[in-house]
Amino acid sequence: INTLGETVVTVQENNHLVVLDYAGKVVADFSAGTVDLDGIDASDDGALIFNEQQAERLREPDALQWIDNDHFAIANEGDMDGGARGWTIFNKRGEVVYESGTSFERAVIEAGHYPDKRSDAKGSEPEGMEFAVFEGTPYVFLLSERGSLVGVYDVSNLAEPQLTQLLPSGLSPEGAVAIPSRGLLATANEGDLGEDGGPRAHVMIYQYQDAPAVYPTLTSAGADELIGWGALSGLVAADDM
């Protein structure tokens, strides 16, 4: 709910968005639209190859957050026939102000968090989202359910959000709550590997700091081509390389 008492609702399976006033009257409703995806892995074949396309992919948004009284952001998870692997900022008249395209998923891939087994479905599957202002800077936090990662975006310029950091998450982050007064972000992670002796579903808490990001410690960003990875068996480096 924004400060005008307006609510925006995602009708996910219908790929639609509805804005209601405080009395429940429909102020606006419009399609969430589609995205053309290029340079993705759309095949579950055990190989990280990012040379496929999906045209007019339905956004089918899940979570959303107001950014101000006229703009809101949606996480384009997909549920039935869609999933656009990113996120979008709309104004409440239904105009797209920003579309991430494949840029968020590329960051997930470069950080070694891409879930190849979900390639033929919805890829990194951004589902949850939070918005908060920390020390005067507005941030959108985008949760990659399948990539187990949180993207932190500075949305000071709504037309050009900046990815400032990736936060390693527990398995399958589903929801998030920001507590700016304490400099905290909490995420609820629904993945539960208890039966296999692994981590149970849990909550993670992050603290806001004015310091360089410490994650990821290794990335394939800057390579001539997009390189995905998920494990390392050996590593060597030298100062003069």
What are these regions (language model features)?
Residues 1-241:
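Sequence/structural signature of beta-propeller domains
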